[in-house]
């Protein structure tokens, strides 16, 4: 943790940088300001981290009018506001709220530091046709494993935009044989849980929209 102080134009600024995610409660008493840093779970029943995929120089899929990174961010912010409005006992934390590139490792770290109950990463599909309507769900499993693998490898290519990504990700290289083997071993993890959650989300999504 670090504390930075600055005074300019008659205003004092104190910046506190913490290595964990906290909620802050402020109390004033005379000339003193007291700050209490509390874990989100001390205030909320559940903590949800919403991750808007891509960002910054990584545009994701690019269409004639829109970039995936911008749609992801818009959906993430709308989704977060909806959760806050309907479920006040749930704390919403975003990996990004502006057009910036957040390293993949940092996205996971944010969720881990907050001890999140659920991590939701939002991405948008691309399609050559303008008429498709519906939902696609990708789950790492044994069926159509190679197609799932291609999606995972492509999404993780974003790390090439990061400085010193080879060291940060312990030698991981997008597209390499070693990385392919690693993903093959990892794709079975949480398969059942992923399928159940995806099924519930898809049914709710289709049931509350005009999509087929």
Predicted features along the sequence, with ranges:
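Generic non-transmembrane alpha-helical segments
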Residues: 200, 204-208
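Catalytic-core regions of hydrolytic enzymes
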Residues: 39-178, 183, 187-199
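Signal-peptide-cleaved, periplasmic/extracellular N-terminal interaction regions immediately downstream
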Residues: 1-48, 67, 71-74, 85
């Amino acid at each position: 943790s670090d504390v930075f102080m600055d005074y300019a134009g008659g205003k004092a600024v104190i910046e506190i940088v913490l290595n964990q995610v906290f909620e802050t409660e402020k109390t004033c008493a005379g000339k003193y300001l007291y700050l209490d840093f509390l874990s989100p779970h001390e205030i909320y029943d559940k903590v949800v981290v919403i991750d808007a995929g891509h960002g910054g120089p990584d545009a994701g899929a690019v269409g004639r009018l829109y970039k995936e990174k911008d749609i992801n961010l818009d959906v993430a912010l709308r989704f977060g506001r909806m959760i806050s409005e309907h479920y006040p006992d749930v704390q919403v934390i975003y990996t990004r709220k502006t057009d910036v590139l957040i390293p993949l490792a940092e996205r996971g770290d944010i969720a881990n530091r907050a001890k999140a109950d659920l991590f939701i990463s939002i991405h948008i599909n691309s399609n050559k046709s303008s008429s498709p309507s519906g939902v696609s769900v990708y789950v790492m499993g044994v069926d159509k494993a190679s197609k799932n693998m291609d999606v995972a490898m492509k999404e993780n290519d974003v790390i090439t935009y990061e400085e010193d990504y080879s060291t940060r990700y312990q030698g991981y290289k997008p597209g390499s044989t070693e990385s392919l083997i690693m993903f093959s071993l990892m794709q079975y993890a949480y398969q059942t849980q992923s399928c159940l959650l995806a099924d519930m989300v898809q049914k709710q999504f289709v049931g509350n929209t005009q999509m087929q």
